Amino acid sequence: MKYFLAAILVSVFSSISLAQGEDSTKYERDEMIISEFLPGIYSNYNQVYFNNRGKVPDEERHLRREIEVQEIETNIFSVKDTFVMANIFEKPITEDDKKTSHAIINVEANNKDKAVQLDIYKSDESYSLNDIDGSPDCTVMMIRGAEEFYARESSGDCDGMTNVYTLSKKHLFVRMDKDSGINTKEPYKLNEARPFQCYVDIPGVSGGRDLPYKRYEPFYIHDQGGTFEILTDHEKRNLVFRLVRVDWEINNHIGVFTRDVMVLYAEERTDEGYKINGYTFTEPDITRVGINFKWMLVSCFMESNKFATPFM
């Protein structure tokens, strides 16, 4: 009898084992995660700030860089890669100050080579899928780490491309070009940015000034150094506002661990130079922040009060 039961159990478990025909490979699963992580706006504002604060030699400093990734089709993404060649503290940033390239990334599990393959193709702002008919300009093989994916190897002519180094839910690191002219192998460290909308009221609440009220809006920026400027109607003041989610690379006092913050700066261009009127800081993951100086109020938010759900 016990042999009969054993035979039945073997038969049942064998059937269960053989029934797993829908299992994917782990690289096919990783392909889905990478395709979920990739879209977004990324900026290395934080890296540039701490290069300056840490007095990194000029020849080793990274340029300001922003990368925008959007899904075109399943597993196919457009890449707008922009270097900002001017300093926001010296002049307003214009399109002439930007050097932009375009690419298309195709994401595909490579079970044979045990990785997720990123094929990167040069493109233009039209992002025509005809650009990916031939061989890729650069190929990066991504494998999974503890909390991120990293490039095991790359091939092709990857200089001048968005040569992905690591990718997580919160960041995109890009390998330094060999002919960049910058004397460092440290990658470009771009943090994912969140979109915000802002407005400015002049005067602000309890302003106490005899000026006609005006709201300047809307302005769309992000929280990785996103900036907008206004010229006020009556006093002709050139006000600048900047939103930064600070990812501290250092501690700002000996013996303490400095926690990340969200900072909203209120600044101004004057005949005497660039000045900071003030700033506020709070927890890094908040979705709205504001300052009221009375003579001026600025508010930035991810969701407008126009669309907020009423509550008690």
Regions found by a protein language model. Give the residues of each.
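Sec-dependent N-terminal signal peptides
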Residues: 4-13
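Short, solvent-exposed loop/hinge segments that bridge or flank secondary-structure elements
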Residues: 23, 27-34, 39-78
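Calycin-type beta-barrel ligand-binding domains and close structural analogs
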Residues: 31-39, 45-52, 81-312
